[in-house]
Each structure stands twice: as C-alpha cells, then as structure tokens.
Amino acid sequence: IAHKKNMLTTSYVSPEMSKLDEKAKEAGIIIMNEIGVDPGYDHMTAMDIIDRVHEEGGKIDNFHSLCGALCAPEASYNPFRYKFSWSPKGVVMAGNNDAQYLENGKVINLDTTLLFKNPLEINFPGVELMHVYPNRDSLPYIDLYGIKEAKTMYRGTFRYPNWCAALDLLKALKLTSYEEQDLKGRTYAQLTAEINGLDANNLKEDIKTKYTIDENHAGLKAIEWLGVLDPKPIPLEKGSTFDLTSDLMIEKMMMEDDERDMVIMQHIFIITRANGNREKIVSRMIDYGDKHYTSIARTVSLPAAICVKLILDKAITETGVHIPIKKSIYFNVLNELKKHGISMEETTTKL
C-alpha cells in the first residue's frame, strides 16, 4: 500500500487483510486473495453459475461446493488411500477444525470430534464413490456469493473411502493433539496406550473393545499400518502426537516420482427458475498431474498467474481487497484457464 503496488495471494483473506480495503482503494491498488484452486477456482466457477441463475430470475435453494487434492486412483493403494501432493502437516491440521454449515435452513455446528463421522457419500464419475467431510465454516459464503435465499450452504473436502474412518480413530486416540509430551525412551505403542488408559501389551485388542470395531475396520487397518501401535522407539525426546503422526505420514505417504496426483471439484446446485421449475445443476472438474507438473501446482498457480497478467494488462481494474467473485474479475480468468485445459463440465437435470 505504501508503495502503491498491486498484490496477489492464493491464501484466504484474513480479518487483518480485510481491514486494508479502504487504504488499498485510496492507494489505487488491488490486493487480490483466494485466487488458487480452493480457494479460487471454486469461487469463480460457482459465481459463474450463480450469476447466470440470478440474471435469468432464478434462485439458489441448495449449494454444495466440494474439492479434493488427492493421488490418482491407481496410486491410492495404501490403507489411508491418500498420498500428499501438498503441505502434509496442513492436511492433518485441517482435520482438527470444527465445522459449521447450513442444512435445510438450520445451522449445523460440528465439534472437531465429530468432523469425520458420517461423511457424505458423493458419486464422482470417472473416479468412484467419494467421501466428503465439511470445511471449517461455510456460512460466510452465503453473503459472499450473494445467495441469501439458500437453505443449504455446504463446502466440503473430497477423500477416498478409508480416510475419514482412519482420521476419526486417530483423533479418538488423541494422536493428532498439539499438546507437547515427554517422549524420551518410549515406544509408539506405549505412548498410544498411556494417553488412552490402555494396555501397551494388548493395545490393538483394547482399541477394538473400546470402540466396538473389528479386525477389518478401515481405520484400525490404517493406523496399524502407519505404525502408531508399534513397539518401536520414538525418535524424539519431546513433541506432540500431531508431530509424531504427521511425521509417520510424511515417511510413508508421499507421492512417488512416477505417480500422478489429481484435483477434483464438484458444485451441486438445486435451483428454482423464475417460472417455478426446479433443476439440479452439477458442475465437475477432474485434473491429473503429469510428468512435468502436479495437478495441485497447475490448478493453484495458473489462476494466480492469469490474474496477474490481467491486472498488468488493465483488463482487471478493480481496487481494494478482493476475492475473485465479481464477473469483472472471474470472467476473463475462466476463459484463459480453458485455454490451458482447466474447465468444468456442467449438466442440468429437471426435478
């Protein structure tokens, strides 16, 4: 702002950033945020549909906006069915959030302990039946997207089946806590047993009894494979179970050089047209990495790079603090992204 230079990030707008809106306008600059894939491409493709529906006199009744950065199906062979294509600790950290969304006119608040219980099941053609857990807070998007008429507003994260069961059990066993522990001279099994009041020598059986699960429970298979039940010495003297769990995941769950990542996105709208007819609009994207770039790198960086060029070319002339929800911003960005093979496929069904 002091140097009157435009700025762009792919990060969420912080409250501190929002407060700079007037100062940025006075300086005649734009501070563009949330212009990656999620957030970013999700905003732009959602607003493209919302604006079209509103322009035609319709209204948005329900909106589910779902996205996942995953490994491609052929690489999803470990018991978590997940490999990291971006910040590993960030992925695990997201699992410690509470969640809030609107469902049939009612605000649903989910404590972090319930985050991975009862995931939505959503079919994604070309992939498989996916599980979805809710993002931190979907409610601000009702105002941001201008859909005050909506009865359901849900933003969520796609995962293959197994992930939610595994994370739910890890959390129940206090294995994603940020609290620092004395780890000197202890094994993974001893620590897991001690913080849960279980017997380290009979740990797996104790867990099955405590949580009423059997040998074939997807979560139990996953955490056993990860190593948190092993009588193996912990290599740290101090640290949190979050650190230990995420370190084990980094060791075992990174993408191999010959494996592809994948980003999938799906918007599901239920709308009412001006004539009273109801329709379901489903908009989908599936994007794979290749030998040159990961999908997550392409889908985060291209919207940002295109937006930078449009600002420099004066095709975007807004000032102040923004996210890409105005047509004057998203329209040209989406058109340019199509030239790079990033686009949504849209289908409409009458209800």
Locations of the language-model features?
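Rossmann-fold NAD(P)-binding glycine/threonine-rich loop
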Residues: 2, 10-33
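Extended, hydrophobic alpha-helical segments in both membrane/secreted and soluble proteins
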Residues: 6-7, 333
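Adenosine-phosphate binding glycine-rich loop
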Residues: 23-71, 308
